[in-house]
Structures are given as C-alpha cells and as structure tokens.
Amino acid sequence: MKRREAIQLFTAAAATTAIGGRVFAQSQKLRVLILGGTGFLGPHFVEALQAGGHQLTLFNRGKSNPGLFNNLETLIGDRDGKLDALKGREWDVVIDDSGYVPRQVQLTADLLKDHIRHYIFVSSISVYGTFPKPGLNEDDKVATPPDAKVEEVTGETYAGLKAGCEQVIESTYGARSTIVRPHYVVGPGDSTDRFTYWVVRVARGGQVLAPGSANDPLKYIDVRDLAAFMRRCAEQRPAGRFNACTPPGAHT
C-alpha cells in the first residue's frame, strides 16, 4: 500500500472521530465478524462499527467480559479448533482481534476463506523487533516466525508469532487481506497503565526516574483512533500492511 493511500485512510478515519461518524452515512452496511471483541480493543471496534450501522457478530470463548454486548449476536467457541459455530455462515469482513498463534489463525482462515470477502488482521508494531527504529515503513524486515511447535506467547516469542500470523493471512487471502500493525495502544479500557502512568507521574511534578532521554521519539495510538481506522479498513477493504501510530516526533 502506497503511503499516500495510507494517509488518505488515516485522514478519513480521523474525520470519523471528529464528526461522530457522519462522514460514512452513505457507506454500504456490512456484515462484520469480530474474532474476539470483548477485551481492550474490541469494544472500541464494536462502537465504531455500530456508529456506521454495520451488522456485527462476535466470536469468542465467552470468558472475558461475558454479557458485555447482550444486544449483539455472540458465537461461542475457541480458536484452537472449536470453530463449529462459524460453519455455514457468511460475512463481508472479518476483523481478527485475537490471533496470536499461526496454527490457530490458519484454522480460522481456512474455514472462512470461501465465506467472507475480506480479512483484517490486528498485528503489532512489535513484529519489527523489541525496539523499532524511527521511520519504519511497512516493507521493513520483520521477526522470523519461530518453529511451528512454539505456541506459548511470551515476551521473546510474541514478535515472531505475530509475524507468522501475518504470513498465514497474506498467503491465504492475498489482496483480500489487510494487516494493521498498531504501536502502543492507549486510551479507555487499557489495564496495563504502561503509558498513562508516566503522564500522571510527570504531571505530579518533581524529579522522575525514567528510561531513555527527553529526545527519544514516542509512538502510540489512541484506541478510539485505531477503532475509527479499523472501521475505515472494513469499509474500504485496502490490500496491504499499515503501521498505525502517531505522526513522527518527540513528546515532552
């Protein structure tokens, strides 16, 4: 995907947030399947897609925040082979918010291949390595997927497993796929406190012991902006990979 096209998508997504979604008033109403949907990112994806009038179905284990969306169709299953609830159904777009292990992603991808129009996979900026350099673009080298027997998600395996999941989706769907690589996602519902801690601590004043220097670039994306972009991807179905983060620069 050319950078100009990516900027156009991000600009339109930002406009959605700014004007309450009215920019998409004339867009086609889609049947969207969200794999996951009840963690940190998912509820924001649901809100953004509902604002566009799209018909949503969730597929998850029913363990995280059960009953959060009683007004939505929720199919209960498991990515590790318990996919019967998805059989015989069709959707326009799938948003994969719960893919971490290539083998499991392959199972879902194969099952849905002939029953959907487009697959959007939520990956991570971590595929580039632990400390990505400034100015990365979507064609830069990513981590090497681990041996197929490695399925435990840890700090050491996360990047490679996510990169392996990307390979599965791109090889299965080709131009019918979108890979979104968010940087650190922040905003309402984030339980990690990995970003907000520093903002609050600095606001309190006094000396702060912190890693790095004040000149280090800082990259993140507000979960609501990410959700608006995901909606745009669902509606436009662009092929390719996208880094989802703030514009370049340092924050002080």
Give names to the regions the model predicted.
Residues R3-A25:
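N-terminal export signals
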Residues L35-G52:
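N-terminal Rossmann NAD(P)H-binding glycine-rich loop of SDR-like oxidoreductase domains
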Residues F59-K63:
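N-terminal Rossmann-fold cofactor-binding loop
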Residues I76-W91:
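Conserved Rossmann-fold cofactor-binding substructure of NAD(P)-dependent oxidoreductases
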Residues R89-P146, G164-E166:
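NAD(P)-cofactor binding segment of oxidoreductase domains
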Residues K149-I179:
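Active-site Tyr-X1-5-Lys
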Residues T172-L218:
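NAD(P)-dependent short-chain dehydrogenase/reductase
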Residues V200-V208, D216-A250:
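Alpha-helical substrate-binding/gating segment
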